[in-house]
């Protein structure tokens, strides 16, 4: 018996339906672009050529395959990750011919090409770079001499690499009475490590350990070419310090043969010119007039080549930029303190800032200028280097970031990169997208939600990582070692993936419109290196923010109380970093802004971090700070408190109780407000949202289906906002567009349903693996307290912070951090270190105790060293609830018998499988755990100005219209679904299985079939079934919906010989009202699975090629010569991800399949 359920939807109800008709007879430019996205909106991909294995036929097939599914651009990389070398060396005539052929083919097909500027993926280097033009580092040697006599002495030459060394200076100074060297000099001088947002250390240094500047003698002119110093030494003990520079020795990587060499000096335009002439110009010469047309872009990937801290002429550049000579401060680069601890630290701040400025100007900006001179755009990933990310990113025509698939997705770079684009006035924010671990086991449904979240961070262009060039046609083919999601023509779902590409293109067209809307502008500070900040608390309150660096701060102006940029950005408030340090010229700019009416918040600074204009700079900082903060012109208040108390309406406010796992972004054009809203959960949900828009008709633009609908229920408010209830499906995203004045007479303001809802069903083939209740470490972190404590010996700890302490990589693809709280005697201390750095603690004769140790990727909101709390196993409790029919389970302390768990963030963590797919959910206390199947929802829609209620269940709808009149209507009955159970005829490709036509008595996974050809099959098979539909069921007020149940992984639906849609994510439902007919109907469902099953099956067969570990040792003759294989294997994987004992993946049409009937009732 169905149970009677009140379906309360609060004040409002909306539905986004596949059943409505398209909206308006007059198609606007926005609608036209949504319906048929332009090339600019389409996805792009990296295109990796592997170890010189390239073929013309493969090039043509690759590019044609890209075009066929809607990829607009290939971005060429050349790498070597251990695959056997092919015949084509990088930059050889053969390679240049193949690049030229690629460009000709791209032109013919209508694609664009970009090329990475160097072999490998970082950064700019090659065998034509001599040591003179390579990255340079400061080296030194020192001797101690006794004075009161003349000396003629050979000074030891400092460390020399690659037989190249040049002197910088020779300095002498009295030997300090106390030996105390600068802590962490390798990152303070950028001689080995990188630390971001580094400010002067204020610890007091004893005067006996400090060199006085006036006592430093410059002996450079006394050193001859042979390294012999002649000098009359004053009385006392003197240190003679010889400083010079030598190459770091860093090379570009991972480069194939012909392309591997020294990394170029990135602070020298002369060196960059040499690099261009040897590495870029030959390509341009070969391509000719294809450059600037088909080949229109050159890329510098993320910076991964370490530090450098000198270039020829650095001293002159420093004096020009900083206004003082660095010569007397050079001993700091050898670890000595000059003048005082603080002055030394401030010089080092200037030193790092200068390195960042020179890299931005002489490498990135100069490279951009060379690109422009040759008709190319410049793309850049501006991070991970010894520079200011905001400054470097501003040099790019297309600024790029990255995000990974698999595991928990951290979005470190999208926010600051999108901010750079916004400040540059660009609507294109590129992203190296879905970087991850290969294995041919990912597909569009798994990627979608991560991509949706990336868009909400500001990305507007996906550039897939990666399409690996396939010189041969044996699948799954070449791979980028174990890296990357496999986007290429040999993947099982490549053709079917066009529906995913269409979704991307429609979405990115919308996201590229107008300008980003943000209320807060966050100043990232003046330090270099500088990675910017993440402030998720701003978005959690319903606002958005951009970041701005010191390079753009001077561009700001105030208009009508808003902080404005020259490209049209407008912000309500400028937020300063929490710091005691700021340069006076920056404070002068803040003064100008607040005098013009800007709102500025932040902590009051005390000093300048620089030695420029020392010490008058400090007096000026104090004067300005006292004035600005003393007069209340700048408020010392947190951004959260400011937003809560400033009477600034939230731009996007969820008024429902459950606000988590919803992300948004807002774009604004002259005519429209465009909100993108994404549900990250694998369950449908209803939320009520208040938008900071008024007197405009909301519309729902659904990029998956390409439909545009008007909601039936919404309301304007007097405060200038509009409330709109949204029904979001599992992992669904929609655009809410406000563009026309509201004049819909059929609008409703409230609705309530009481429905006879059928009993809930559990998720298909649900198996609970484990359920725990308590407070967990954030995703991406691992508690390693016990393992670190075991390393303490004799009250000493000497370890390297690495994932060797973990059973796995807790955050693949991200730079991780080690944090520890420990005790020495009575003192409790904390320490942190980046991955691969060393931690050395010596407690002497006191006891050293490790209290907490955590390793992984910390979220911005995770402060200090989080505690690992004990959790409760509630696996059996959850199983009991399911067995008793409770599928929506309250998450509270009753799960552990009413006891109170330790910790302040109580959550249930549950791992389960449904149809063989493993999922892990984290559900916080107070929210229900939903383990029921998703099912059709009732909807209220507007069709051609008529309000209609569409419901799959009988019941009553009560509603109120604009005039306040309350009415009701009833649907007394809804026809039962047509169940398509029983036998199905299934056809497999005849060339891949021994028995290609089979009959399934019931739907099952191919992996459960005894026939090994089917059990291990990977590819596409067709399901066939006929069913009857009565004339009565096709009456005008019935809607029919095909529900495939579970599918692994993509289904193409053909009904009565007509393709009606490709379903690539759950729920696998499709409106077929206009496709069925009275009487017999013929249904065909083409289902595509993934490669792992066939790869597992092939591992049971003899190898017909050589392996070295998981890699291919040599390319077999049968593949090179296209001859018959000597074994029954059908696959050729370049990397072994799967073994013969691995569990097979669920595959095929799993069902249950049915035709749902929904009744349409006009109001």
Swiss-Prot record:
Molecular function GO terms recorded: beta-glucuronidase activity
Regulation: induction: By ulvan and rhamnose.
Alphabetical list of InterPro entries matching this protein: Beta-mannosidase-like_N2, Galactose-bd-like_sf
Catalytic reaction annotation: a beta-D-glucuronoside + H2O = D-glucuronate + an alcohol
Listed GO CC annotations: periplasmic space
Domain of life: Bacteria
EC number(s) recorded for this UniProt protein: 3.2.1.31
Keyword Hydrolase: yes
Principal cellular location given in the protein's record: periplasm
Signal peptide: 1-20
UniProt entry keywords in alphabetical sequence: Hydrolase, Periplasm, Signal
Locations listed in the record: Periplasm
PANTHER family reported in the protein's UniProt record: GLYCOSYL HYDROLASE (PTHR43817), HYDROLASE, FAMILY 43, PUTATIVE (AFU_ORTHOLOGUE AFUA_3G01660)-RELATED (PTHR43817:SF1)
Function (record text): Glycoside hydrolase involved in ulvan degradation. Ulvan is the main polysaccharide component of the Ulvales (green seaweed) cell wall. It is composed of disaccharide building blocks comprising 3-sulfated rhamnose (Rha3S) linked to D-glucuronic acid (GlcA), L-iduronic acid (IduA), or D-xylose (Xyl).
Similarity field: Belongs to the glycosyl hydrolase 2 family.
Name of the protein this chain belongs to: Putative beta-glucuronidase
Species this protein is from: Formosa agariphila (strain DSM 15362 / KCTC 12365 / LMG 23005 / KMM 3901 / M-2Alg 35-1)
